[in-house]
């Protein structure tokens, strides 16, 4: 599929998703409207409810952000550029739309026959602007792209950045190690892990040393958090089905 077509499809998907979220702009994401119109987004919500809204560093203050370092940096920098809630949302939404187009193009490079499918995914329309996860998805897809072309060092660098943006890409590491194992490339696996870990550490260490409590908050929250909206576990809990050690169970099922 031609690059122009991929870009058009991705742009249309991002525009439709923006229209889906746009009712909230009119009433400034007030409750219950943001839930009635299904346009809730972390973008404006966290600006007002976290320290970045008062100009503080993302991982300092009484209310640090519940995101890894790179996402927190994006949240902080965009807050410096746009202090008003609507402007902050629009700025971040524009960046996310560009990232989505980039992700669609990378997907097409990895599997050309599937290049258009991403833009027609209902989940994209429903949740494109709900948070900053596309920053991690973009670098994750770059990592997959380089790995597919056997550029393992670049892939490891990209996945290290991705994990420092959102932790879920860490689950690609066992897949990569298995591929190295299948190809009897132990040295390659060790090098891949070393570059990934070194990249993640280089990004995280300055923040962990200077604002340790704020840095740890993301990990602490996800270890302790209960079933949240939008999850199967929340639906089960609403039906009276409680599950102990839910976070550990989720990790095991994902693996």
Role assignments for model-derived ranges:
Residues 1-144, 180-255:
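Primarily membrane-embedded glycan-assembly and transfer machineries that use lipid-linked glycans
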